């Protein structure tokens, strides 16, 4: 009911959602209970004045210090956060501590001159010299990493085996770790959101961040860049804790404890501090505080997407969008992923079987919920949906606030330790992949009229389908209808209907056809055959038209046979009885001529629109 209300009246929906949030305050999302404002207030009173993930209640949740080669700090910052979450959850599947492959991300992120699937010329970033957390997120959410392989590690802080030469992009020996959620936080100009960041560090582990590293901002391994400084961030690191009483160059105390990637012989055994009041750390919207959460061994065999480069822009003012996909094999849809561009977003996911004449049809699944924080999210389907090879399907996403994140050709604005600025990374799109709702009409995003012509024809929404192999289960044709008509005028056009249904296993596909019908009269069926009818579609109606026999005051009987094409032994019979009246519709020669013409030219009925 809520989904229908949302689509029919957005204004009323906003009022209803506000009322729901104020009344209930608790909304279940993916197995968690998200407390709105009440939760944040409660957490604030319980947070310690200092915290260190290396000594959290007697446990260490930080992997060892690395020594980066080249401009790969961004890869080390992201992997430190991924590894930290794995240590907290215990989801790492190999012996020892997690040691993920920074240089696989460095080579195969898809934004650089070595590899960009969207650009055959491979223009873009220079390998080993640039990236950020949006780049790493695009790579993770495609399911290409994070890679764990013993071959990537040499037991030293440098872990350099894969730096000089690119490793294989895919290898069956790799373990791939996937962050189900990635969240971006901003502490705020008055640190009004700092407790959220602290709570996430305590519950989700190490968090990625960035700063403008410079001797002018560093004093005894304590960093502080004033807010009025114009320098952009140039180095990525990771937050592992804090101290509210740590004195810094800022007017007020308080600092983040930072894990660097310059070896353990730098700083305080590889660590240092950044003031709470730093310009970028905890403040930059894309690099300030990034939490990689619910990291697990990738459990999906395929990830369908059109947004190769992930979240590059947001289409404001649009709430409804969908992506179209075609199953490459027999697969079941187990999860959907997407980004939200603001906090506290109510979403609705729907899966459709068809997009016909500008309308999404045959809804197979729906789910609603609330996403508490900005970022990337993976939503499991309680009941997987099976699709046969070649079957098209459509993932609809309604986002109440913030607009729809999308990929497009873009200039990388935050280019850490890069040799040059203003690098353009090309994306590509095709017509028929992404659609957005404009008024009451679905429009192909491929033709969106961007002001910048270089963006046109390159944009796709960040909506992904996560699938596994599926063994199609048996479909079963069912029909219990009959056609029984009385007092039918001879040689008259008769209209009737019956319905069929697939009562087989969930999400099985029924392919059917009408193979037999009575040999009296002239018959047409709309449609006469069909495919991919699922149990979830419910009854499917078939329209029947026939020219009644010319003989008066007679009862005619016959059968309509519908067959399951994939299992001919599964068929249904619709019994037909027609009793003609004593009165003719026409008489004499005209009647006989009409009958003969109808029999000789079956399309005559359609031509006459009878």
Give the location of each predicted region.
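Short, surface-exposed loop/turn segments at beta-strand-coil junctions that are enriched for proline
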Residues: 384-386, 547-553
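Short, surface-exposed beta-strand/loop patches at domain edges
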Residues: 398-471
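Surface-exposed binding patches on compact interaction domains or structured appendages
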Residues: 449-452, 472-481, 504-544
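A short beta-strand micro-motif common to beta-rich folds, especially ectodomain repeats
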Residues: 554-566
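Aromatic- and Gly/Pro-enriched, solvent-exposed loop/edge beta-strand patches characteristic
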Residues: 343-429
